[in-house]
Amino acid sequence: MIILDTSIWIEHLKNNQNFFSKISKLLENGEILAVECIFGELLQGVKKESEKDIILNFWRHLPKEHYENIIIEAGEYSAKNKLLDYGIGLIDAIILMHGIKSNAKIWTLDNKFLRMIPEELRYSK
């Protein structure tokens, strides 16, 4: 499975052809894992009702994993690995923890975040 970070979702939703066809293929193959905080970030930036509907439609139909206490574990992981010192906040730590727990690759355009993702969890297209 692959977790698309907010930056990747934005490129897909903007129909950026450098990303759109690859992501569409991953979606068709059921390879995308939805993470709640990513969709929360996407919803935070909507400007039109139609954008909200598109995002919520993806949310409703994509596979998800629920992990009890994942935010607490992400906070502990962040403290242990000093992620804040590298400019990585709790949301990215939660995304990283989802990747660790589900063994999903993480695809991001955020270079700061990318450097903190263990090599085996980095998605490269």
Say what each PLM segment does:
Residues 1, 96, 100-125:
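Acidic, PIN/NYN-like endoribonuclease modules and their adjacent C-terminal/linker elements
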Residues 60-83:
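Acidic catalytic patch
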Residues 29-31, 61-62, 100-105:
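Short active-site oxyanion
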Residues 8-9, 38, 70, 95, ...:
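Alpha-helix capping/helix-boundary segments
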Residues 20, 35, 39, 52, ...:
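A general structural signal for well-ordered alpha-helical segments in protein cores
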Residues 1-34, 44-56, 125:
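Short, well-structured N-terminal submotif of metal-dependent ribonuclease cores
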